């Protein structure tokens, strides 16, 4: 299976820093800010069948509603090339509504049933289809 992992957490560039690519790697933000430009945003990994699109550079950490709508186009653009597209989004789930299914992952110490029910209800109201919640230690 071919998998495309998209780092859609626009508030933090965890994966970009982890792979020590510096601040020059183009990614999701570059596509959202200028969708008509032909960006080379897919990074091929050394794991067969796994490619990554990093966050890219977002100096203001703001993505407009129109730019979020462009994210749907990004998913559609690559959906025929990959068996699965996995998106890591920010805590607000700004991009989750454009995904077919959503899985919420929470740290055990940050988990409460009340907060989780609130988050699930909010995401469902935004049009997300929630598969479930994973609580990690």
Ranges and model annotations:
Residues 1-2, 128:
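Short phosphate-binding/catalytic loops that engage adenosine nucleotides
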Residues 5-80:
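P-loop/Walker-type NTP enzyme "switch/lid" segment
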Residues 4-6, 51-53, 103, 131-134:
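Hydrophobic/aromatic beta-strand patches that form the interior of the parallel beta-sheet core
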């Amino acid at each position: 299976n071919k998998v495309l992992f998209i780092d859609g957490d626009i508030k933090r560039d965890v994966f970009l820093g982890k792979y020590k690519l510096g601040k020059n790697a183009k990614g999701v933000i570059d596509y959202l800010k200028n969708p008509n430009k032909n960006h080379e945003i897919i990074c091929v990994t050394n794991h067969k069948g796994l490619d990554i699109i990093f966050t890219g550079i977002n100096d203001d950490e703001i993505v407009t509603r129109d730019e979020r709508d462009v994210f749907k186009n990004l998913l559609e653009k690559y959906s025929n090339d990959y068996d699965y597209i996995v998106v890591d989004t920010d805590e607000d789930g700004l991009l989750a509504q454009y995904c077919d299914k959503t899985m919420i992952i929470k740290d055990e110490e940050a988990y409460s049933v009340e907060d989780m029910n609130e988050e699930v209800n909010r995401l469902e109201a935004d049009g997300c289809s929630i598969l479930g919640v994973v609580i990690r230690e």
